[in-house]
């Protein structure tokens, strides 16, 4: 399973998720949407540019999680 977090460094909800990732030592690819490439990939893949967004890739399937609470809950059950 591959995890990628689309985030903005100024977003308080993103900071909450980032702190959880750091605390739990989860291996997540961080993608700052300040980069045009990451912002475009988020819109193309997930359909919107809302952050935070966790992309979960497993067995050829993609799942896009957008709410910080949902993302944190998902990470806690890994």
Predicted regions and their residues:
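GST-like domain detector, emphasizing the conserved glutathione-binding G-site
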Residues: 1-9, 15-78
